[in-house]
């Protein structure tokens, strides 16, 4: 493999690692193995620390291909816990509400899950890693 010229690699990101942790550790080990001070390494999409799954990592000139991978169709598999909420919508923050779930049937859950199939336009929550550019127009004087 020619990591300096560019390679596309697939990693299974471990639980509790950030995407940055994975890239940083790989970059460190790779630069030591190749005996170079600096090597270009990037990833094609962030996974939350509490998510595990495939991360596409590119090296060298292959980092120019990141956009090709970043916006491809993705599949998510989730385990959920009904009846509890957190401010971050995941387990990174403490549970802030507990609600009864006895009335919820399997059929209702399966019906709701169908709304998550296909192309979905999402509004990222406040705790999202999504970068948003804010523009404020000058106010008239």
Predicted regions, residues:
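Positively charged, low-complexity/disordered segments
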Residues: 139-141
